[in-house]
A protein has these predicted regions:
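Generic short beta-strand segments
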Residues: 41-47, 78
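Short, recurring structural edge motifs at helix starts
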Residues: 21-27, 126-134, 159-162
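Short glycine/acidic-rich loop motifs that flank beta-strands on beta-rich extracellular proteins
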Residues: 8-15, 47-53, 60, 81-88, ...
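Extracellular beta-strand-rich solenoid/capping regions of secreted or surface-exposed proteins
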Residues: 6-39, 48-68, 87-89
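Acidic glycine-/aspartate-rich tracts in secreted/extracellular proteins
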Residues: 4-5, 43
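Conserved donor-binding loop and adjoining core beta-sheet/short helix segment
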Residues: 22, 119-121
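Parallel beta-helix/beta-solenoid
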Residues: 2, 12, 33, 38, ...
């Protein structure tokens, strides 16, 4: 994105900012979407504009599934409502570097949603129902490096797993965490 570009959510609904591709017709595995780069910009999820922010549920900012070679760098993500800034399910070879994640709905006491959520492609218990097929594809070869997490509930992680499937080669290094309300990182079944 051009230097100084700002994208601000203005809808009063709890919808995503960015969903990669068609959620019903993916190739499955890691072959759905490839070679994606998001470089720079400020993405303001603007929870302040949501009409029913005290009602159950929030909204994920970016949702990316069944993909490979995804890079998100040098971007700023602001003002999330009770969910993840970035959510990945079944993604191989992802890099999130040089980003800032800041601001989370302050009145939400049930927090714990990670800024960067690493998931598997399943509809079990509503873990990652956004991308079919539900083939159990996990995330592999993830690098989360040189980011800043400030005034949020949790930095990086997952709170789901599938029997017999594991997340592989997840690297979280050189990040800075300020005023984290719950956990810096949490990943199951590495």
């Amino acid at each position: 994105m051009q230097g100084g570009a700002v994208i601000t959510k203005t809808s009063a609904t709890k919808h995503l900012i960015l969903r990669l591709g068609n959620t019903k017709d993916s190739q499955g595995g890691y072959d759905g979407y490839q070679n994606i780069v998001i470089d720079g910009g400020t993405w303001d999820y603007n929870y302040q504009c949501v009409a029913d922010k005290d009602a159950p549920g929030g909204f994920v900012g970016f949702c990316i599934g069944h993909a490979r070679n995804v890079t998100i760098k040098n971007a700023t993500f602001l003002n999330n409502l009770k969910s993840h800034f970035l959510e990945f399910g079944g993604v191989k070879n992802a890099r999130i570097t040089g980003c800032t994640f800041s601001g989370y709905y302050k009145n939400y006491v049930g927090g714990g949603q990670e800024c960067i959520q690493i998931d598997c492609c399943t509809d079990e218990t509503n873990v990652f129902p956004q991308y079919r097929p539900y083939d159990g594809t996990t995330c592999e070869d993830f690098v989360v490096d040189g980011n800043v997490f400030s005034d949020v509930f949790s930095g990086v992680g997952t709170h789901s797993m599938m029997s017999g499937e594991t997340y592989k080669r997840i690297t979280v290094t050189n990040n800075t965490f300020h005023n984290i309300k719950k956990s810096l990182h949490r990943i199951y079944e590495l």
